């Protein structure tokens, strides 16, 4: 009986010791949930190393600006802390790693909310939703489909599609166009260059990015053809560490009070 009692006491002490040691392993002020952010006095927000105007970009005066930067600044102000931007993520998928590892409190970086990423981090409600779209090389498209055949051609698309490597659209392409030949490029600019050079038949991204390309190329209607999907959308959301439920709850309430903008409104208000 005495032996059993000693065993129970030992187990109780051991479990409490484990809890204490685990707690000591998290230095004060480094947590990404609200308490840790307030204690630290700053909100660490991750964006990619490559500019994504109009969401975040360095303007002609050398200032980091854009829609996502303004959104992050408002959140820091509401929390009463300073904003720190980290650009250690080379690609969009790398943002998820930064947040999951605790090196950033959140990612506010035109980040698509996908099932694969949601295995690692938690996402807010979308603060923006775009239509997905294909942008075709019009000359190359005319060789495989007439104007009236384009919709049926796309439903069973077997052509080449250019996407950004390690992006949500690399995954979307595999799911939505299983018979297509998918070519990954380091940047969107590289993909668009391949499109205009005729190296790929189309590029795949959201409506905002496609509209930016069309606006940047003189007489683009003669060389390029956009196709937007009403049934395929791209929800843009904020990612936080899976354990930080209170922070996620706060972010969702914050977003409820923000005006949702369309792709055209963002382009008009944040012209690079």
Indicate residue ranges for each PLM-predicted region.
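Hydrophobic residues within well-ordered alpha-helices
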Residues: 75, 98-100, 154, 195-196, ...
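Short beta-strand-to-loop elements that line the ligand-binding cleft
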Residues: 82-91, 163, 180-187
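Flexible hinge/capping segments at coil-to-helix
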Residues: 125, 138-160
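Extracytoplasmic small-molecule ligand-binding "clamshell" domains
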Residues: 25-110, 119
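Alpha-to-beta junction loops
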Residues: 43-44, 80-82, 100-109, 159-160, ...
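A ligand-binding cleft/hinge motif common to bilobed small-molecule-binding domains
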Residues: 93-94, 110-119, 171-175, 196-197, ...
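Ligand-binding clefts/hinges and TM-proximal coupling segments of bilobed small-molecule sensing domains
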Residues: 24-28, 164-177, 223-224, 252-272
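Periplasmic-binding protein-like
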Residues: 49, 128-136, 140-141, 207-256, ...
């Amino acid at each position: 009986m005495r032996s059993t009692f000693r065993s129970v006491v030992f187990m109780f002490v051991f479990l409490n010791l484990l809890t204490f040691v685990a707690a000591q392993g998290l230095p004060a002020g480094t947590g990404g949930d609200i308490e840790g952010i307030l204690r630290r006095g700053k909100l660490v927000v991750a964006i990619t190393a490559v500019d994504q105007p109009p969401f975040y970009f360095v303007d002609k005066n050398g200032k980091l600006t854009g829609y996502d930067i303004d959104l992050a600044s408002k959140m820091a102000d509401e929390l009463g802390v300073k904003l720190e931007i980290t650009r250690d993520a080379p690609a969009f998928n790398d943002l998820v790693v930064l947040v999951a590892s605790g090196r950033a409190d959140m990612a506010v970086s035109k980040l698509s909310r996908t099932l694969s990423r949601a295995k690692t981090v938690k996402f807010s409600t979308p603060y923006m939703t775009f239509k997905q779209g294909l942008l075709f090389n019009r000359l190359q498209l005319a060789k495989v489909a007439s104007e009236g055949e384009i919709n049926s051609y796309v439903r069973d698309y077997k052509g080449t599609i250019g996407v950004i490597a390690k992006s949500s659209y690399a995954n979307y392409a595999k799911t939505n166009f299983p018979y297509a030949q998918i070519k990954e490029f380091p940047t969107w600019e590289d993909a668009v260059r391949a499109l205009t050079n005729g190296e790929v038949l189309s590029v795949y991204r959201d409506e905002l990015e496609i509209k930016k390309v069309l606006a940047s190329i003189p007489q683009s209607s003669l060389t390029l053809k956009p196709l937007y999907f009403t049934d395929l959308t791209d929800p843009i959301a904020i990612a936080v560490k899976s354990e930080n439920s209170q922070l996620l709850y706060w972010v969702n309430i914050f977003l409820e009070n923000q005006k949702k903008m369309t792709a055209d409104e963002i382009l008009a208000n944040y012209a690079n």
